[in-house]
Amino acid sequence: MGASDIGEMTSGRDWQARYPELCARAKGTNVNDRTLLATDYLNHVNEIIMLLELVPDAPECLEDCRAWRPMSYTEHFEASSIADRDLAIEAYEFSPPEFRGTFDRLIREMHRVIAGALAGLEAATAQGDEERARRVVELAVRALKTMVDHASSTIHGDAQVMDQAEIDGLMDMM
């Protein structure tokens, strides 16, 4: 990907000057010094995974699931208290497109899976269908954990990414 493509993704900022500076600042922090992404964001998704897993045996946890809201990467870190939150927010804009593009796509798909799971749980609960609720949770959690693993790999700079066909396959299971 060329510098002009990267420049477009970073709102026209001087990526070539800022990227090396941010990589240097990221060393020894919670922000990956190559991808400029931080795994702490995945805690937000892991929270809803944990809540979803509780619902079949503790239906009252559905209320907690309803209260959960998707957050963008920046929103998550703005609400975070981790020491490197300001760096995480600043560096995100300069994450190379081969990482950030994949990461952002995975996050969008995770949010879509979560919305579908919540809708499925609502319907199953309204009908008193515990078996269907378990199946919805099982499929959603499996898909979400796979996507979280891929997002984590992306954050750590693994070039192997989940292609759209793999994501669609997970979605078809739901």
PLM regions with names:
Residues 2-26, 74-78, 82:
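Acidic, low-complexity proline/glycine-rich segments
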Residues 26-47, 54, 60-68, 88-109, ...:
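Non-transmembrane, amphipathic alpha-helical segments
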Residues 65, 71-82, 98-120:
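Amphipathic, heptad-repeat alpha-helices with coiled-coil/zipper character that mediate oligomerization
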Residues 70-80, 133-146:
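Eukaryote-specific, cytoplasm-facing alpha-helical/coiled-coil scaffolding segments in long proteins
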Residues 78-92:
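Charged/polar, low-hydrophobicity segments characteristic of intrinsically disordered regions
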Residues 141-174:
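Glycine-rich, aromatic-bearing surface loops/beta-hairpins
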